[in-house]
Curated annotation (Swiss-Prot):
Organism: Dasypus novemcinctus (Nine-banded armadillo)
TM helices/strands, residue ranges: 1-21, 26-46, 47-67, 87-107, 152-172
EC supergroup of this enzyme: translocase
Protein name: NADH-ubiquinone oxidoreductase chain 6
Subcellular location as annotated: Mitochondrion membrane
Key words of the record: Electron transport, Membrane, Mitochondrion, NAD, Respiratory chain, Translocase, Transmembrane, Transmembrane helix, Transport, Ubiquinone
Cysteine-cysteine disulfides: none
Length: 175
C-alpha cells in the first residue's frame, strides 16, 4: 500500500510542477484539480477515508466552480500549451528532472531523515488499537491533534487566509 501512496505522491508533485509552469489558466486549473484528487487519494491510502472523502467533496466541488468561472473569464481562442514556449517547456522538464533525481536519491540512499520540531509527549498521538479493530480512527485523531498540538498551525493558516483576502482586494481594486 505504501508503494501506491509513493506513486500517488510522485503524481502529486508532478501535478504541481505542471501547475507552476502553466502557460494558460486552463492548464493551471487542470493541474490543481489533478493535484487535489491525487492528494485525496493519498489521504485515503493512509487510512483517512472520511477525511479524504470530505476534502474531495469540498475542495474539488468548490474549486471546480471557481475554475469554471475563472477559465470562462480568461478564456483564449488559442490557449498556449506546455510545448508551445521553450521557457515553459524547459521549466517543466527541469521540475520533472528534479523529481526523478529525488526519487533515485531516495531509492539509492534507502532512508530519508525527518525534521524534528521538538514536540514533547508524543505518546498522545498514538492511536489505541487492538487486533484488527481500532478504538480511535486515525483521521479523527489527526484532526484532534491538529487543534491540540498544532494550534500555531491553525493560527498561521487563519492569518494567511485573512491576508490573502486583502491581497485579492488590492489586486482587483482598480478594475
Amino acid at each position: 500500500m505504501m508503494y501506491m501512496v509513493f506513486l500517488l505522491s510522485v503524481a502529486f508533485v508532478i501535478s504541481f510542477i505542471g501547475f507552476s509552469s502553466k502557460p494558460s489558466p486552463i492548464y493551471g486549473g487542470l493541474g490543481l484539480i489533478v493535484g487535489g484528487g491525487v492528494g485525496c487519494g493519498i489521504v485515503m491510502g493512509l487510512g483517512g477515508s472520511f477525511l479524504g472523502l470530505m476534502v474531495f467533496l469540498v475542495y474539488l466541488g468548490g474549486m471546480l466552480v471557481v475554475f469554471g468561472y475563472t477559465t470562462a473569464m480568461a478564456t483564449e481562442e488559442y490557449p498556449e500549451a506546455w510545448g508551445s514556449n521553450v521557457v515553459i517547456l524547459s521549466a517543466l522538464f527541469v521540475g520533472l528532472l528534479v523529481e526523478v533525481a529525488m526519487i533515485v536519491w531516495m531509492i539509492v540512499d534507502g532512508e530519508v531523515g525527518l525534521i524534528s520540531c521538538g514536540l514533547k509527549d508524543m505518546e498522545d498521538w498514538v492511536v489505541l488499537g487492538g487486533y484488527g479493530m481500532d478504538v480511535v480512527r486515525e483521521d479523527y485523531a489527526g484532526g484532534s491533534a491538529l487543534y491540540t498540538y498544532g494550534d500555531w498551525l491553525v493560527i498561521l493558516a487563519g492569518w494567511s487566509l485573512f491576508v490573502s483576502i486583502f491581497i485579492v482586494i488590492e489586486i482587483t481594486r482598480g478594475r
